[in-house]
Amino acid sequence: MTNWFARPVLHVTDVDASLRFFVNRLGFTSPWRYQQDGKAHVAQVDRQGCALILADTWPEKIGKGLIFISLNVEPATREAATAALDALRAELQANDAPVKEGSWGYRLLVVDDPDGNQLFFNYPSDPNETASGNMVRDEA
């Protein structure tokens, strides 16, 4: 069996500045970077199984990224997921990360990186809210 592993790319103006943001404000680590003449042009940041690539290689794509990041919480309850996201919000705010509320038909915690790329963390849906649509899952 082969497992797939995705690493989305966020296009940024300055990889070194973005590394400082993701490491110092968002709590990621950086296992590697590609440099030329002492300047990083591509790097990876990781946090708890979430890996992102930062690159300055396509200027026309800078700041146009949007990534959904889900937290797998044990036990897998609505209350535990909400508590985990509230704890993440508190951690990020303590590190002066730009955290705001958002919505995608449900509540989001939104973080904008220095270039305007967005990280969306979804809160569990409220079973008491009335949705205008419904989720349809294809049969496997």
Question: Predicted regions: what is each one?
Answer:
Residues M1-L19, I67-L71, Y123-A140:
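N-terminal beta-strand motif that seeds the catalytic metal site of vicinal oxygen chelate
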Residues V9-L52:
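Core segments of cupin and vicinal oxygen chelate
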Residues V12-D16, I67-Q118, Y123:
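Vicinal oxygen chelate
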Residues D37-H41, I62-G63, S103-R107:
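Short acidic/glycine-enriched loop/turn segments that link adjacent beta-strands
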Residues G49-I53, G116-L119:
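Short, charged/polar, Gly/Pro-enriched secondary-structure boundary elements
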